[in-house]
Design a protein with these regions (language model features):
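Charged, amphipathic alpha-helical segments
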Residues: 1-5, 46-49, 96-97
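A short, Trp-centered hydrophobic/proline-enriched beta-strand micro-motif
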Residues: 9-23, 62-64
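General beta-strand recognition
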Residues: 18, 42-43, 74, 120
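Short glycine/serine/proline-enriched coil/turn segments at secondary-structure junctions
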Residues: 26, 70-71
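Conserved beta-strand in the GNAT
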Residues: 31-33
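A short mixed-secondary-structure module that forms the rim of ligand-binding clefts
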Residues: 35-70
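Charged, gly/pro-rich active-site loop segments
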Residues: 74-135
Length: 135
């Protein structure tokens, strides 16, 4: 299993994970459920109409936190918002109810991955494994 696959596996096992962004000078955290490992990058998706996307546009610093029952993950870096239409199509294929809502409301899904990123797999007391990802 590759390093990025290890990180993806923890996020998958967690089911719900958390995305932290910056809003002005304040942190904002919210739960997310969608992620997709595609071309050796983990993509996340949020609506471009949402505050979270606007926060990422203004300040690309972001962090994912997840707990899979065994490991705590901190995965942080710079959100690359260039998008990937193939990822959006796959997201809508995997989540048809979301696709319907987005289509009905004329919304767009913004997908991003973390670049210049660090992933820390931790226990309660220390970092067990650490990985760097630069694309």
């Amino acid at each position: 299993m590759s390093d990025i696959e290890k990180i993806n596996d923890i996020i998958t096992k967690a089911e719900v994970f958390y995305l932290a962004t910056v809003d002005g000078d304040k942190p904002k955290v919210r739960p997310l459920g969608f992620h997709l490992l595609f071309e050796d990058k983990i993509y996340f998706g949020v609506g471009t109409h949402k505050d979270v996307y606007k926060q990422l546009e203004a300040n690309q610093s972001a962090e994912i936190a997840a707990w899979d029952g065994e490991h705590f993950l901190r995965y942080y870096g710079t959100a690359d918002l260039t998008g990937n239409e193939a990822v959006v199509e796959k997201a809508f294929e995997l989540m048809p109810e979301i696709a319907e809502a987005y289509k009905a409301n004329n919304w767009e899904m913004g997908v991003f991955f973390l670049n210049d990123a660090t992933a820390e797999i931790r226990n309660m007391f220390a970092i067990e494994e650490s990985y760097e990802f630069k694309y």
